[in-house]
Structures are given as C-alpha cells and as structure tokens.
Amino acid sequence: MVAYYHDNTLLHESEILQIMENQLLHTPDGVRDIYNGECKKKLYLQDKLHRTLLKYGYHDIMTPTFEFFNIFGSDVGTTPSKDLYKFFDKEGNTLVLRPDFTPSIARSAAKYYIEDDMPVKLCYLGNTFINSSDYQGRLKESTQCGAELIGDGSISADAEILSMTVESMLESGLKNFQISVGHSQFFYGLTKAAGLSGEQEENLRELIANKNFFGVEEFVDSLSMNDKLRKLFGLLDNFDLQDEQLMEALKLAKGYDEILSSIDTLLKLREYLKAYGIEKYISYELGLISDYTYYTGIIFQGYTYGTGEPIVKGGRYDKLLSHFGKDAAAIGFAIVVDQLMAALSRQDIDVPVIENYSLIVFDEAAYHAAIKRSMELRRDGVNTQMVLKDKNKTKEDYASYAVDNRINRVEFIEE
C-alpha cells in the first residue's frame, strides 16, 4: 500500500484521493459561493448602496484586483504583509491581491488628478482579499462599497462622509446601528505625552483593540504622569462621550497639542452633524483605534446587532497621497457588504428583491411559438427562461421547479 504526507500527516492513497475529490466540490477556507436568492439580494443591496453614493455627486472608479506589493507596503500603513495574498509575475515582480481599496484609489488619484486643486469625489464597489486566520469563519474575500473625498481637509468634508455613511445604513434597511467616531491623534497624543516607548505603545494599542480596559488601567497605573494626563487616559474606556465630557476633556488637554486638537475637532464636528440631523446615530469614543496607521484625523466604525465585526469603517488620511506623489487631504469609508448582509439576515430585515421571471415550457413541435412568446415577454421586461418539455415530467414538476427558483409564472406552449 502506498502512503503520502499531506500537511505533515501520513495518509494512505485512498485518503489522498478522497481529499482531492473533496477539493473538486468545496471552496478553500474563507471564500464561498453565493447563488440564487442570496445572490439576488446581495446584488440588489449593492446597487442600492451604490446609488446612495452617486446621489452625493461621487463618480465611479475601478482599480485593479492586484497591484504591485509596494502599494500596500508597511510604510503605507495598511494590511500587514503576513496577511496579504502575494504572488509573482513573469518578470519576478511581487504582486498582491487588493486587501484595502484606499491605497489603490490614493495611487490612482495621484496619477490621474496630480494637477487638480479642486476636490475629487470617487466611489467604488469590489472585492478585497485578506489572508487572515485570526478568527475561524471570517471571510478572506469580502465585498466593499465605499467612497473617497480627496482634496478637502475641512470638517464639513468629515460631516459629509459621515452623513453618507448613515444614509447608506438607512437605505439598506437597518434601523438600529451606531457609528462610533474617534480621532487618531488622541491616542498618538497620549502616548507622546506619556513618553511611551514603541513597545509600550504597541502593548497599549493591543489592550485597547481587545477592549481589555482592566489591562489598560493596570498599564496606566504603572506609569508616572500628572493627574490631568491620567484623567485623559481614563477616557479610553468611554464608548459614548457626551458634550460636557468632551468639554471637560478639552480643558484637561491644554498643553498637549495633539490631544487638544483632536477633541476640538470632534466638538466642531458635532455641530456640523446637527445640520444633517444624524446625531442620534453617532457616538464619540476616544479609545477608538484602527489597524490602519495611515489615518491622521477622525476615524469611525459602524456596528449593529447580529455581527461582531464592523459593518462600516473609515477615517481621514491626509498624508497617504503624498506617498504616491500628491499632497492632498482625504477622507473615506467602506461598507463591508457581507457583514451588512449577515446583520440584515439576523435581524430578520428583508431585502425586497422584486422577482419578475417567467418560465416557458414547450414541446418540440411548438418551438417557433415558444420563441415568439419568450421574445415578447423579454421585450416587456420579463426575465424569461425556456425549457424543452421532458415527457417524463409533469406540469406539477415544472411548477415546483418554478417555486424553487423564484419564478413567478409558468406557461406551457404545446402544438
């Protein structure tokens, strides 16, 4: 009997053949097929989200599914190298499947809008690929729909992006969701004021990312600092800071420029958001941090019931385009469509797909009549499927087939 090693395990030939047979039918971990009703709902939802972005005057852009490795290199501040899908072209260049739309669009904007000094508003829809094994069941290929506002560093631009985010969530059918807004410079300012080393900063970042605020408290207690700074560190575990708390934080931040500026920006942002009437969907969280280090201003994440992952994320990145040769402020966001679909399903919120399908079942002698009828229906906007009648099938069989495939009506055309 022949034996082989597979994934460092000794297997017999019959077991290897079974593995190969399974791989013919099954997808790799982290990717999945989407078909029938679920596929229709996803396409409908994507179209609705996309139309919401267009309403704000954004223009479509498509970037390549794969790019050169340095577009997503460590100096860019995006997905870690270990989580990238990397491969080589014939010339030996390292290529990467797109893990994040923002660097791709920043590169594209720097190339095609290098001389523009007016705002550029771009939106997109496509898939991203992250080879992460941190969480069992997490998709490694996911669909994102998002927008980028380039060339506008104002707080009004921040407010517009947040308004688009909220309106997109409402258009999807969600009613109960919250957009947590923070500022990247608050965390940076704290670590700078406390004189933390790179290792200490990374330890603190990990504690906050894991929501381990007992660990944060213990970490802060081990440091020597004044009372004002200690109180500012104490705000890291508050997920919904009110006006008076932000005003108090502003007083404590005097003397710490980055911290002061970040809190002042959030207070001003609140006033802009009132004009859009979306305050009830916004909360302020100074402990909010992002895995992406290219953010320089506000950052935000959207949450709802039925999913532990953010359904939307975004922020301001005023230095990223300079990496590609264009000095321009920018802000953007991405809706994770798959997470949004999961949330809608778990909250029993229906995606109202309109079915308009017809089935023409015909026998051989009625072929020309069936063609004529199907063409009439298609001209009228009805999605029409033709099936040659099988003498072993009954009309009830075809009616059942229509129900299973969400076909509204069945017509039988016989000679």
Q: What are these model-predicted stretches?
A:
Residues 83-89, 196-216:
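Acidic, His- and aromatic-enriched active-site or binding-groove loops in soluble protein domains
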Residues 38-52, 67-68, 102-115, 122-174, ...:
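Positively charged, Gly/Ser-enriched RNA/tRNA-binding surfaces
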Residues 7-9, 13:
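Short hydrophobic alpha-helical segments enriched in small aliphatic residues
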Residues 140-145, 181-189:
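Short, conserved phosphate-binding/catalytic loop or strand-edge motifs used
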Residues 19-103, 159, 180:
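TRNA-binding/sensing appendages of the translation machinery
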Residues 176-186, 204, 283-287:
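Short, surface-exposed recognition loops or helix-turn segments adjacent to catalytic cores
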Residues 63-71, 120-131, 178-187:
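Short, glycine/charge-rich beta-strand/loop segments that flank catalytic centers
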